[in-house]
From Swiss-Prot:
Gene3D superfamilies: Glycosidases, Golgi alpha-mannosidase II. This is Endo-1,6-beta-D-glucanase BGN16.3. One of its GO terms (biological process) is glucosylceramide catabolic process. Induction: By fungal cell walls. It comes from Trichoderma harzianum (Hypocrea lixii). GO terms for cellular component: extracellular region; membrane.
């Protein structure tokens, strides 16, 4: 849960940077290329000296990396990178003129900028919604198991419309939705907001009074998916509950047990989607890496109906190798990093690290929290809203600014296209408190290879890269930067 961990996650201040410097030429052009974004802000997807074959001219600090770009090194295929489209995002973006919004979306969704192809969105209100909190079937607090009062409302319609615009710019875009709470009338506490007692779905799991609203909960997803599709926003996947182990008060939350989630998926939500002719996939969990038993227990019940597991970054002792352990147990189940915040006071490389770590450990995609906010980190709920959640993009006085986190994520998304295959590699290491080098590589559909290198040392590092295909590449990686090499096809 992001708020309890603010103090432990803050670091050096992020820099606010303006429009991106476009690479001088296409990342798919002949020959090796290199692009960098850094803490200082003078590199923003900037073309720098490309690596050369052989040893080159090593500097005083060198580091060896290796990748297996043969079939024996193939790992997961990339689905994409992006962020959460929240009510705050939609509201902030819609402050822009039509022409400025068009330019912004083009930079987010196409090769003109980040080429984002994975977007999460909030089903109803989240902590990054303006007052009041809402769902798509509040019905005045009255029970509505037949969903006769279902309505996206102005905010849901605006969100669906914006997601459809994004899909129109990038046909590869995958959209997944997550609710922060079921409608209050479906819950034991009869409220959208969380609390310490009865902040649970009224599905009989705690009360032994029958399924109650389990079927209605499933139909809520069906209605929402159909409504968004009617606006041109296809929903590719859902999670049943954002942060199911979070029952925090002050904003929409809902506690959900692992066995409860497994039962809901197997006996209600999956059958309802199938009966409605929907191909939307179900992702389990959607919470931190410190409770891996939760998704494992869900898989024990509903493995046939779960296509992926979703993870967040807020564990006190964050360890992305949990994803590798899960992969070893469930090699046919996809994994995604679906939420990590990007506060303006966070470490410069925070977004790079929460993208790098999951990719090294079998994640097929990464989504930050959140895509866009105002310069005041909102709009957000007045009670319990996140007042320090800065978007990858901030909107102020009719203009937009890309934050450091945007560039860090774009170092991956722009150069690791949909369908790229992540490669196994060696040489990544971070010293406790004194920097290090982390890397991840991919074999792209056109045969080129991408190597993303994160240097957290206070000096440049000369990288020597060996490939299993028999090549040697060398080049400089600037201090406190994320640098991407694009190597030609073998």
């Amino acid at each position: 849960m992001r708020y309890a961990l603010i103090a432990s996650m803050l670091g050096q201040a992020a820099i606010s940077v303006a429009m991106p410097s476009e690479p001088a030429h296409s990342p798919r052009a002949a020959g090796a290329q290199a692009y960098a974004s850094n803490q200082a802000g003078n590199y923003k997807l900037t073309s720098i000296a490309a690596p050369v074959q052989g040893n080159g001219s090593p500097g005083p600090s060198t580091w060896n990396l290796s990748i297996d770009d043969t079939s024996s090194g193939y790992k997961q295929k990339i689905v994409g990178f992006g962020a959460a489209v929240t009510d705050a995002t939609v509201s902030a973006f819609n402050e822009l003129s039509a022409s400025t919004l068009s330019q912004l979306l083009d930079e987010l969704m196409t090769g003109a900028g980040a080429s984002f192809s994975l977007m999460r969105h909030t089903i109803g209100a989240s902590d990054l919604s303006g007052d009041p909190a809402y769902t798509y079937d509040d019905n005045g607090g009255n029970a509505d198991p037949g969903m006769t009062g279902f309505n996206l409302g102005d905010r849901g319609t605006a969100m669906a419309t914006m997601l459809a615009q994004m899909k129109g710019l990038n046909s590869n875009l995958q959209i997944f939705g997550s609710p922060w709470s079921a409608p209050g009338w479906m819950k034991l506490n009869n409220a959208i907001d969380g609390n310490t007692n009865n902040n649970n779905l009224n599905d009989g799991y705690l009360t032994n009074n029958g399924a109650q609203y389990s079927a209605a909960f499933a139909q809520y997803f069906v209605k929402y998916i159909q409504a968004f599709e009617s606006h041109g926003a296809t929903i590719n996947a859902i999670t049943l509950q954002n942060e199911p182990l979070n029952s925090q008060a002050g904003y929409p939350t809902m506690y959900m047990f692992s066995y409860e989630q497994g039962d809901l998926i197997q006996n209600y939500v999956a059958p309802a989607l199938k009966a409605a002719g929907l191909s939307t996939k179900i992702w389990a969990y959607d919470h931190n890496t410190d409770q891996p038993d939760f998704p494992e227990q869900v898989m024990g019940i509903a493995a046939d109906d779960v296509s992926a597991v979703a993870w967040h970054c807020y564990a006190t002792n964050l360890d992305w190798t949990v994803l590798t352990n899960f992969h070893n147990s469930y090699p046919n189940t996809d994994q995604y990093m679906t939420e990590c915040w990007t506060p303006s006071t966070g470490a410069w490389n925070q977004a790079a690290s929460f993208t790098m770590g999951p990719l090294q450990n079998w994640a097929r995609g990464v989504a930050a929290w959140t895509l866009g906010t105002t310069a005041q980190d909102g709009p957000h709920l007045s009670s319990g809203g996140c007042g320090t959640c800065t978007g990858l993009v901030t909107i102020n006085n009719g203009q937009y600014t890309f934050q450091t986190a945007y560039y860090m994520m774009a170092q991956f998304s722009k150069f690791m296209p949909v369908g790229a295959t992540v490669l196994s590699g060696t040489g990544s290491y971070t010293y406790s408190g004194s920097g290090g080098v982390q890397s991840v590589a991919s074999l792209n559909p056109d045969g080129t290879r991408t190597v993303v290198i994160e240097n957290t040392f206070g000096n440049d590092i000369y990288i020597h890269l060996s490939t299993s295909s028999g090549q040697e590449w060398s080049g400089n990686v600037p201090t406190n930067s994320v640098t991407t090499w694009v190597l030609p096809a073998v």
